[in-house]
């Protein structure tokens, strides 16, 4: 299985990079993991609704350019479906069973994802109603993907 995580913005925090790298290394025995970062759109602190839409659209275009047409897309969105770790594992296993060998998780920038990205997504998943920094979300996501594979294989880790 090929799993791609497309996220907006460059990861700068060393402690997050170390955590992500550790889980990517652990995942190596289960799946091929690609981390793709697209540039975030520079914007002032105070934006009108129209300006926010423009920023999200530009970031969305960059995201969509990185996703092939044969990829199953899971957009991380606050209004998406919340799952337990077991449900996430079962869903990933089901995708593999039905021949979906390319899966992309998409993490938006600080303003979220543009409607075009949400429309392209095959599903939307939420990790809760709290707002998290998108770079921290990447670490949480990689850990949950690793946990999913451990659950699928019946290996100890998940408690």
UniProtKB/Swiss-Prot annotation:
Keywords: Cytoplasm, Methyltransferase, rRNA processing, S-adenosyl-L-methionine, Transferase
This enzyme's EC code(s): 2.1.1.177
Keyword Acyltransferase listed: no
Broad class of where this protein is predominantly found: cytoplasm
Binding-site residues, S-adenosyl-L-methionine: 76, 108, 127-132
A single GO molecular function term of this UniProt record: rRNA (pseudouridine-N3-)-methyltransferase activity
InterPro entries linked: Alpha/beta_knot_MTases (IPR029028), RlmH-like (IPR003742), tRNA_m1G_MTases_N (IPR029026)
A Pfam family assignment: SPOUT_MTase
Subcellular location: Cytoplasm
GO cellular component term, pick one: cytoplasm
Transmembrane segments: none
Similarity-based family: Belongs to the RNA methyltransferase RlmH family.
Subunit structure and binding partners: Homodimer.
HAMAP family named among the record's database cross-references: 23SrRNA_methyltr_H
Protein's UniProt name: Ribosomal RNA large subunit methyltransferase H
Natural source organism: Lysinibacillus sphaericus (strain C3-41)
Gene that encodes it: rlmH
